């Protein structure tokens, strides 16, 4: 999980979602998981 100021999808499998008011990227590849901080 990376904490970034701006989250961007890194591949075509990445999905941008909102959880508890936070923007997150979830993906099949665990290295692509990101959370906005």
From Swiss-Prot:
GO terms for biological process: translation. GO terms for cellular component: cytoplasm; ribonucleoprotein complex; ribosome. It comes from the Bacteria. SUPFAM superfamilies: Ribosomal protein L36. HAMAP family: Ribosomal_bL36. It comes from Sulfurihydrogenibium sp. (strain YO3AOP1). NCBIfam families: rpmJ_bact. Belongs to the bacterial ribosomal protein bL36 family. GO terms for molecular function: structural constituent of ribosome. InterPro entries: Ribosomal_bL36, Ribosomal_bL36_sp. This is Large ribosomal subunit protein bL36. Keywords: Ribonucleoprotein, Ribosomal protein.
